[in-house]
Amino acid sequence: MENERKKEHLENFLKSNFKSNTLFDNVYIEHFALTDLNFDEIDTSVNFLGKKLSFPLLINAMTGGAETSYDVNEDLARLCKNFNIAFESGSQKVALQDDELVETFTIVKDILDEKNIIISNLSALSSLEDAKKAVEMLNSDAISLHLNPAQEIVQFEGDRNFKGILENIENIVKNLDVPVIIKETGCGISKKTCEKLLNVGVKYIDISGYGGTNFIEIENLRRTDLDFTNIYGWGIPTAKCIIDCRKISKDFTLIGSGGIKTGEDIAKAIILGSDMIAIAGEVLRYLIHGGYKFAEDYLKSLIYQTKMIMLLLGVKNIEELKQVEYKIFGKLKEICEY
């Protein structure tokens, strides 16, 4: 049943068409005509989880368990290796329940080596024992525990009881041997949520804001008994999440994600306060609709666009990009000033 649900998720993701807004279009950054840089010398490398990446990007696989997942995960892992960027697995819950599905996840270990970054993935409601098993399965550098109450409550067979989730996160953070990333799944991390996570020792937060893959829509497309289309707009826009969470503290790694599709999106997300960027749906669309080369060309374009914007801002590396001044306006300014 879990395997079939994963297959439906992938199919419905490709069917989904609700248009949401990250509010990056409400962020103004200013062109610098006297740029004094050589494009080929612009450095996009970053250190993440103790390893050096060529670009501050994490690809979230989103898949695993379904028959098509093996090929998708294999191609995503190849992309991550070739571009020297990080790979995050889709939820490994299905593989912990069914040994026959483990191979759809472990294929990435045949491609990625100790120089690459692999991140496991489970629900934040998972036990410490399952978290350990998920890390062992992929020999991961870290584990991402996802928060997805909106998805679960719309999902017919989803969780309804979220009691004790913060205490569970704290237990895993304190007792797991690898770093723990806490991530949302498209509805965003608020200031209040971020503060609570930092207070229990979380050092890595993926804000996964509203503006990208909409799991409320994906789950609603599976339902025939109830309709949740009026809730498709639920969530905190990605730009607001980044601004609010970074204001709280600079002493944690902030991963910006949720509807990031272009080099300009990446540049703005970093300027607002992100240390890393995560992309899931956009890469998956290119891969499924056009194949490996299509996805490869998309990532090449994404990196080129980001470097181009860095050149036009007069910054030569990611640390300088973080210092670029910006202005916010429109709806983003309204909802950030409360």
Question: Whereabouts are the PLM-identified features?
Answer:
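Hydrophobic faces of well-ordered beta-strands that scaffold small-molecule active sites
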Residues: 57-60, 85-89, 116-122, 145, ...
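Glycine-rich phosphate/ribose-binding loops and adjacent secondary-structure elements
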Residues: 163-289
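An N-cap/entry alpha-helix motif that binds or orients negatively charged groups
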Residues: 1-49, 53, 331-338
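A gly/proline- and charged-residue-enriched helix-loop-helix capping module
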Residues: 84-122
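Short, acidic/polar
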Residues: 69-77, 126-136, 189-192, 262-266
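Active-site cofactor/substrate anionic-group-binding motifs, chiefly glycine-
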Residues: 48-98
